């Protein structure tokens, strides 16, 4: 009966465990997103430099995150680099490193795109008004860049949240891992519980990401 299958979710501490797993997901996402924003802003400015070395390195960074799947990066960091250099690295730390590496690269490209989308005549106008390059960047380029960047950055943040289930494969006990443990424990008593439990996980992700996506859409319509 559906009622008995669904009751597995509220048996013992199952629902609290699921909420705890969601908390791990959100914590990993929040830390990775915050670090990605800071590093991505710096990387975006570096991408605009005319130095061929920095351009080549930033291009290599960007191509790496675009070509190599995030799961492969997780395995390389957690199983490869940590053991090769004899580093005690938790799954959570490996996840933050990989997601920050990925997010910063994507954010840097967004910053570069936002900066290059500003017409050259605005820089020329700022120079004609006697503004230095630093003043032109602060008062003319930066406000417009932020406006164009925020909706895209929010979309990137939702993508990072939706990618976090991959970390269960390196031992991180997040919401999807917890749901699998609950389903395995109830396999004989409630064999159809997976439908309901994964349905609840679906609702959790929807409630987290949908408002953020709506906000990004509204900001994009207003500012773009």
Question: For each predicted feature, which ranges?
Answer:
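Transmembrane alpha-helices and adjacent helix-loop boundaries
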Residues: 1-224
């Amino acid at each position: 009966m559906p009622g008995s299958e669904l009751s597995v979710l509220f048996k013992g501490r199952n629902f609290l465990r699921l909420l705890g797993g969601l908390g791990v997901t959100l914590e990993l996402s929040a830390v990775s997103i915050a670090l990605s924003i800071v590093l991505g802003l710096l990387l975006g400015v570096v991408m605009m430099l005319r130095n061929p070395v920095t351009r080549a390195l930033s291009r290599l960074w960007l191509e790496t995150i675009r070509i190599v799947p995030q799961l492969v990066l997780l395995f390389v960091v957690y199983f490869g680099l940590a053991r090769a250099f004899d580093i005690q690295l938790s799954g959570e730390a490996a996840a933050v490193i990989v997601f920050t590496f990925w997010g910063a690269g994507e954010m840097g490209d967004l910053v570069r795109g936002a900066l290059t989308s500003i017409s050259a005549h605005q820089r020329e106008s700022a120079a004609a008004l006697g503004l230095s390059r630093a003043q032109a960047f602060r008062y003319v380029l930066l406000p417009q860049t932020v406006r164009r960047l925020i909706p895209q950055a929010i979309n990137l943040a939702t993508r990072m949240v939706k990618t976090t289930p991959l970390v269960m494969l390196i031992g991180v006990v997040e919401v999807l891992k917890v749901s699998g443990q609950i389903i395995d424990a109830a396999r004989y008593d409630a064999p159809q519980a997976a439908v309901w439990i994964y349905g609840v996980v679906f609702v959790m992700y929807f409630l987290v990401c949908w408002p953020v996506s709506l906000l990004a859409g509204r900001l994009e319509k207003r500012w773009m």
